[in-house]
Amino acid sequence: QAEELGRKLAEEQPGIDEILYSPLVRAAETARHISEMTGIPMRMEPRLKEQNFGRFESTPRNGEEFMEAKSHFLDHYDGGETMMHLCQRVYNLLDDVKAESDHKTYLLVAHNGISRIVQSYFYDMTNEEFAHFGIKNCEIREYYF
């Protein structure tokens, strides 16, 4: 999927100036494939790391207990990160990108939870929409400041 996206971006030349990527392995490998195929420079951005789910790490994301816990935005998931802290982290990144962008175009390579936060930064969402928002692997969404 990453190689297919890299080929597509290399052919279409959409004017991406820099790739910002999560330090987690899958996102970093995806960013590397895209960078190698397109020549777009890449930079690791720790604020794109997926949410720390505490005791729910490595458990199914569609499990009943996790889905219930996910609706409590202020809870720490027993040792994890609250949804509010995650939002603050990603919103701060987006504010920084906006301030430094000077009309640059960035490709963010991250995770489904991060995409949900990015979507909520640009568009109002209900709790239900927020909880059920998701993207496919290597899907591209465009946002404009």
Residue ranges and their predicted role:
Residues 1-40, 81:
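Active-site-proximal alpha-helix that buttresses catalytic centers in soluble enzyme cores
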Residues 21-22, 88, 109-110:
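Short beta-strand scaffold positions
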Residues 28, 91-145:
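Active-site-adjacent alpha-helix immediately C-terminal to a catalytic or transition-state-stabilizing loop
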Residues 25, 48-49, 113:
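Catalytic metal-binding/acid-base residues of hydrolase active sites
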